[in-house]
Amino acid sequence: IARRQEEGILHDYLENSLLALTDWIANVFRLAKRLEAYEGDAVLQRDLKALPKDIQNAEARLRLENDESVRREIRQVIASKKAQKQNLEQLQDVMEKAEMQLENSLTALGTVYSQFLLLDAKKIDDARARGLAQDIRDEVDALQNVVTTMDEVYGRTI
């Protein structure tokens, strides 16, 4: 579409929009790969399921234990397992938000695609093209923020 436009402001906006769209698609791909890695991580999934029961078992053992040095060790195990559970729950929350952002981005990509087709069909004015370009930049920035947050949280947890 941008190549078919005559040189000028609209052409420049469309070219810039296409570059931003490329970044957007790259971020969508990175986000999808990160989600796929998370969902395929058997250790994380196993720990998410096992930790509540492990904590309960350790707390039950603590109630039955009389030796103070063993009780101290059990308390440390419980604290460690609770911290691990909290970190995994935070990771799970981030991943759920990322999944919603991915879904939102894919929907927005479909919208942008149809807007580009409208641009071509109607040869709309520069103001609308500027608005579309800004929408794309905003979506790219939002998705980049999610990917960066996921990189930080996922990298810190594993």
Describe each region flagged by the PLM.
Residues 60-158:
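Long amphipathic all-alpha helical oligomerization modules
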Residues 1-71:
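Membrane-proximal, non-transmembrane interface segments of integral membrane proteins
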